[in-house]
Every structure is written in structure tokens, then in C-alpha cells.
Amino acid sequence: TPANSLSGTGINAQNNQATFAPVLNNLKTTSSVANFLIIPRTPQNCLGNPFPIVISVNPVATISTQKIVTCSGSSFVSSPINVPQNTSYTWKAPSLSTGVYVVSGNQNFNLIGDSTITGNLTYNGVDSGGISTYTITPKSGNCVGNPFNLLVTVRPLPNVSTASQIACSEAAFSSSPTSNLTNISTLYTWDLPVISPANSILGASANNSPASSISQLLIDTTSNVAQATYTVTPIALGCTGKPFTFIAVINPRPNFSNKDTTICPGYPFAMNPSPLPFITSYTWDAPIFNIQNAVIGGQAQPTPLPSFSQVLTNTTNSIDVMATYKVTPRYGDCVGKPFSLIVTVKASPYITDTLTSTVCSGNPFSVKMPKNLPLGSLYYLSLIHISE
């Protein structure tokens, strides 16, 4: 009892046996009882009175090969199932069955007996892991079962050195730093970064879901370089490595409002907007004039220059002309938003004809100026030559 709980030899009815020696196997994980009724018979074929024999058969743990996966340096626990209650285990130090690199910490042994199989192994390889094989002996009560194997796969821990990346403000960066592991994908989680200078960057956040790369879109709110310093945790094959530092260097994008200036014709002018990041450069398109064919000069500049400079000459003699440039600022590879530069080129009094006047000696003289000169023009008189 219970029914179908036992098997073995001598469990069925027998006749004319010289001894009573059944071999019974308990098929359950709890104790079973076999009730036999024995009828003795003498050599003269005389039958004696029947008598009972009751045999309690305790279970023996029968365990197939077990497998478990653990991370290097982490404790593992194995608890076989479908075994008799209060089964304990003993084992000796495991052996390394696969892997080129040594699995250390394998002096774990237990000769007294424990209810679970525990250990802590370290794997220093750079591949997918090594396997240590434990030979475990189960014991249920006083019944010792056959030894079985426990295969412990020890995964390596990813190790990543400090890494950094330079990115432009308002442009997403993505980085997958290389770990010490060979041909094994590494995932990353990270804490909220430390911003330097404080409050200079928008868009930074933590990420608790393992990602294949460190990626964010950060906005530098200043006109200078800013940094976001992340503490990143690498994860490979389900094992968590030591956190490392990742520094995102965010270059600003020059951002200027529209500018205007007024110049005299024929003289070079330069423009350096402020505030601006150092080493800002500029490109610009050819200007658009409000009066066509009224200005000489004004070319496009496709190659970045450290300042904006041109020479414009107003040929109208009397009307101010506006030149509108579309200017694109840059900081390194970071292109800012284009802005307009409106240059007003003043008209210059220009007289091509020789002006004459005849007066009597001792009397003042005046010279009538051309009508097409700029309003408000003033004149300076110098003696050039006296002829007789």
C-alpha cells in the first residue's frame, strides 16, 4: 500500500521457496508498505499455520542529470524536484568539463548533507561560459540514492572601460561601448546623468530597460560645451557587470537672431555675433539686393570662415541699398539655424564732372552741385592749384 507503489522481485505469489527474500522498489516519494501472508510447509509436505510479514519500504531519491545556469561570482542554488521529503545531498569539488578558461571557486563541497545544492563559481573567460560538473549523492532518511550529475554553466560578466562620445545639441547620439566579451551582445541600463555645468542640458533621463546602445537626444541650452556623465550598467547573457562611466560631450549649436548693420560703400565690414561659442564659423549665400544692379560685390561663401566679411560698393550715388544675406553659423560639425544679416550700403557723393565758377576778385563764390547727390551731403574744399 498504496496500490501500484511497489515493484521488484518476489512481490507476486510464490510456491515452494526455501527462503523469503523479496527485492522491493518504492515507486513513490513516500513510504510504502508490503503485506505478505506466509504459509510454511515441511519437507514432508505438512502445512503450518499462515503468518503475516509486513515490510515498510522507504523511498530512495532517483534523480536524473540536473542543469543550472549562473553568473560568475554569484551564488547558485539547485533543488531537485519529485524527491522524498527531507532528502539531503553531499558532493565533492566539481570538475571542469568544458571551456578553455579555468572556473575558480570550485572547492565547494559538502560531506555532511544539505537540503539544497549550493555554490559560487567564478569564470574569467570571454566566451559564453564554462561548465562545472558536480557529482551529487542524495540521501533520504537512511536510504542513499544513486549519484547524479549537476551541470553548472557559469556565464562571464561583461566589463566595459570608461567611454565617451561627442554629439551636437539637438541631435541624438548612440554608442555601444565594447566589452571584454567576444562575439557576445552587451545591453545597457543607466542612471540619470550628472550635468556639467548644472542645468545646461535638457532631455537627459535614466533608462531601466536593457538597451543595445546608450542613446539620448540632449539639448545644450548654453553657448558653450556641456557634459552629461552617465553611470552605465552592462548586461550580457543575463549577467550584470560592474557599472562604468559614459560621458556625452554636447557641442552647442550657434543660435542668433537676425542682424543688421549700416556701412559706407567700398569699405570692408565684418560681423561677429554675440553671444557665440568659441571657434564659431559661418557660411552664407549670395545676398539679395532690394535694388538690382545697384551694388558691386556680394558673393556667396560656401567654405566656413571664422567671421563674416565683405566689401560692397553702392553705385547709385544717391540711394541707400539693402543687401540681405542668409548666414549659417557652425560650431565644429554642429550647424546652427540660419539667420538674416541685412546690410544697408549708404550712397556716396560722387561727382565726375569738373565744376567751374567765375567771380570778381574779392567777392565770394559758390558752386552749384549736381542734383543726384545724397540728401544732406556736405563738402570740404581744399586748394589744389592756382593758375595765372
Predicted feature locations:
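Proline-enriched interdomain boundary motifs that mark the N-terminal boundary
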Residues: 60-66, 157-163, 253-259, 348-354
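Exposed beta-strand face motif in extracellular beta-rich ectodomains
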Residues: 32-36, 130-134, 226-230, 319-325
